[in-house]
């Protein structure tokens, strides 16, 4: 019958081979025991909205993350946290509140900040999708802290210094800014997919906790200032480069001890140890290399 008579056209059966393959792959992916996300921690720095925090908690629960830490939240009433979390009440119940970012990431072997702003100290290592596999692998033997900044202006440079690596979320240049819950959901989703795609394997290296790495950077800062390597008016300019270099490499506890020894030796040399060294060289008959002109 024609469509003019009010009848529907005959249904045409088109095999959705591509869709079927994709669905089967996703089902098999979820059945495969993947890597664990229990060591992944979401850190919200100075969040302004209780509802946003609740939405982040829900996104975390959807994707299998359970550690949530707030740094100096700018709200008191937690009603909307619980309301927006819906069935993620257990995440909210275990949520910690701390006074500073240092306390939130002190035990983390890897601290990853999220940024949408470009700048000298804000060059991301990659997108959330690109970094997710290595973050999941690191989380098998380390606490991995994922740091999100305030809703209004993101992470400050002081916050960024605690981050070993930075990631970004690509978005349309027409409106590239995501709200807090959206950003958290995207990152958690990429971690979830990466975890499911990677079968459980042997544990990787255990990295030094962030508090020890930060202590190292402070010692290096003092040592470099002692020998005039850093500009006294802006010492953190060059030090940020060291943070990025060593952050990309990943430092084990043994590495931190070696670099602390280097910092102590630099301080000793800058405090007059060079004179003792010169005297020993003269006694040993070693001639110092001539200065370059």
Language-model regions, residue ranges each:
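Post-transcriptional modification and biogenesis factors for structured RNAs
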Residues: 3, 7-293
